[in-house]
Amino acid sequence: MSNCFNPANILLPNDGIDMEKWSVIACDQFTSQADYWEAVEKHVADAPSTLNVVFPEIYLGTIENQENDCNLSGAGVKNDKETGRKTKYASMTDDERIKYINTTMDTYLTDGTLKQAVADGYVLVERTTESGVRLGIVGLIDLDDYDFDPKKKTLIRATEGTVISRIPPRVKIRENAAIELPHVMLLVDDPIDRQKIDGCQGATQEDAVNIAAVKHGIIEYVYAIKDTLRKLYDTELMQGGGHIRGYAVEGEAAKQVTEAFAAKQNSCGGFLFAVGDGNHSLATAKTCWENIKKSGKFTEEQLKTHHARHALVEICNLHSEALEFKPIHRLLTNIDVKDMLSFFEAEITKQGLESTEGDEIVFEYVESGSCDSAKPANGNEVVSENNDGRCTAPIKNSGINITNRGDRLPVEILQGILDKYLETHGNVEIDYIHGDEALHGLVKETKGCGIFLQSIDKSTLFPAINAGGVLPRKTFSIGEANEKRYYMECHKISM
């Protein structure tokens, strides 16, 4: 059996490039907050940046291109015609943006913007956020060891159901790209041997040869000897993303890391990595790779070493204290809230479920009416005000617990009902929102319906995936929105 996690030739910006402007957050974040991406674009200006070689999903599927099947189903996407904004990127069509991305990638490869920073090695990542210091190791996974079909029991597995309609527009972005920039984070179930790691204080280069002997806490052990590694970058991240440092894991240390994960692979029972973030991004990489294999353009020998066979990812330890599972909320817009709530209650009854007042699923929405009728009668109603104290519309919320759901997750029940509702209410749009405050603000801004959920216990993730295949889509998020992965490292995928 070949290793599913391997070293890579990793590209990074050349010396002198502003790393803070280079690194931007994952493209699937802030999909309903155009102000965020406008601020990023303004901040980056003309500097070399990953903003120029990724496609923020808020701009994917503009009105002009929906007729070309490039729309992003269910993403709450807004374009410049809808928002009134005229930024450079908001004004581009999908095809224009993709062409620009491909051209800019080629330019960065030829004009010295990118250089090979690590040869046949890994990058140890140290990310500091409000949740703490989150560690990771960036390397290549073999896409032949991954599948987003829950029936396939591969070494690398999706954690949520893949929305097939979301793949084609992403394939269009990736299929002619020269490089990839990962925001995919995979999780490994690797309990930490704290005693062994604490014994590495004041580590020397000789300690690197012991990595392969580490049975628990591989990433944490490598971090314990970080002072023996070459620092690659050290920068603040824009827009409240915290701080990030990267270290080159090369030579003997890289060989030891490969051996340590190979040993973990041999003892994992056939399930080594779960996709923590970037399920659809990795599904896109897999689809592109399968398309290449089917194209007939390459021999079997050529396919073995084709760059697109592998995807660059960051591996994180499920047991890290700084790796927090956060809920992903729902935002429904263009909706008759009373109609949706009636539908929800009817479906709960139809499924033989019972509910009581609680906080497993909380609906929040703007109630129409005057301020006189907005006087709060109980703690479940909040009157919103302008800065000058004038009453606007009241915000109502109501929460439930489902008492007889057994092993089913509240998000599973909710998403099933929402999917059914959306099938017969084509004008209603759904978006997936990270963070309580963001959803509170969007409910007021859009006059839609926000649905708040609770986080799941991360210790249940691997058993749940191993037993049942996948969780409902958008069940959890690694950290808050500004704690998601920022683009930094690059990997060449064209031949």
Residue ranges and their predicted role:
Residues 2-33, 40-43, 64, 76, ...:
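Long, compositionally biased intrinsically disordered regions
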Residues 66-83, 368-398:
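Intrinsically disordered, low-complexity terminal tails and inter-domain linkers enriched
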Residues 279-343:
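Catalytic or ion-translocation cores adjacent to nucleophile or general acid/base/metal-coordination motifs
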Residues 254-296:
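Active-site beta-strand/loop microenvironment that shapes enzyme catalytic pockets
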Residues 1-232, 460, 465:
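N-terminal extension/subdomain marker
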Residues 242-254:
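Portal/gating segments that form or line small-molecule/metal binding sites
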Residues 174, 186, 278, 442-443, ...:
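A residue-level signal for conserved active-site and pocket-lining positions in enzyme catalytic cores
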Residues 315-371, 395-410, 414:
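C-terminal amphipathic alpha-helical segment
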